[in-house]
Amino acid sequence: MAREHRVLSRLSAGFPLAPNSFLFCDDDEIIGAPFQVMERRHGKVIRRELPEECNARPDINRRIGEMMIDALADLHMIRRDDVGLEDLGHPEGFTQRQLDGWTKRWKDAGAADNTDMERLIAWLYQHRPTLEQSALVHNDYKLDNMLVDNSEPWRAVAILDWDMCTSGEPLADLGYLLNQWAQPDDPPLWIEESTMPTAQSGFPSRTESIERYATQTGYDCDTIHWHYAFAAMRFAVIIQQIYIRYVRGQTQDDRFATFDTRVATYIDKGCRIASL
C-alpha cells in the first residue's frame, strides 16, 4: 500500500489513467490497520464476460482490445524523472532477477519433479534477452485491473492495483498481458484459463496487439515471445504455490484440489510458446 501511494501520488500528475493517492497512514491505531485515501473514479470492470452492449458487436470488442494496448503503451512512454519516480526500483538486471526469483519460488513450492517445467526453465535461461529496455512497469496489467467507462467500454477510465509497480523491462508487462489474451484458435484450456474475453469476435489477435504496441512505443519487440513464455511459467508457479498449500492442509478450500491440472496447462503453454 505504501508503494502504491508513492507511485500514484506522483504518477497521477503525468498519466491520466493513474488515480491520485492523497494519503497513506501506517498507524494501526486509527482504524485498526494501515490505510490509503485515493481519488474515486467511476466506471466498471470487465472480466471474462463482456458487458451486454458488447454482445454481437465485434467493432466494440476491437476498440476495447486496442484500448488495452494503447493504455499500456502510454504508460511505458512516461519518463520516470518527469513524474518524480526516477528512483523507483532497479531496472538494471530486472529480467534476470525475475527469472531467478520465479525459478526459486517453483523449487520452494514443493512441486514433484517435472521434466517439462525443467525444460521450460532451461530454455528461459538459455534464451534470456540480453537487450534491456527500461520503463515504468505495472507488473499486473490486464483488463480486470482497469476501469472502463460505463457507457463507452472502449474508453479507459483508470488502471488499478499499482502495488507491484516498478522500473524494468516494458515487454514484461506486454508478455504478462498476452498470457491472458486468448484468441479463438487457441487450445480450449488456454481459453478457459483466460481472465479476459479476448477470444470473442472482433478482438485483435496477439500478433496484431504486439504490432500495435511496437508501433506506438518504438520498443524492440523481437524477444516478446520470451516474455510471453515467461509469463506462462510465472502463472504456473503462482498456481502451484496455492495448490501445495491445499495439499499440506494449510487451506481447506476444495476449489484448489484440481489446481495441479491448471499448473500443467500453463507449463504446457510455456513449452508450446518456446516451441519445445
Across the structure, where does each feature detected by a protein language model lie?
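All-alpha amphipathic helical-bundle segments outside canonical DNA-binding/catalytic cores
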Residues: 89-90, 220-231
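Active-site activation/catalytic loop segments of kinase-like enzymes and analogous catalytic loops
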Residues: 172-217, 231-249
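ATP-binding pocket architecture of kinase catalytic cores
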Residues: 1-119, 123-136, 150-154, 276
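A short acidic, glycine-rich active-site loop
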Residues: 57-65, 195-202, 257
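Regulatory N- and C-terminal appendages and interdomain linkers associated
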Residues: 237, 241-276
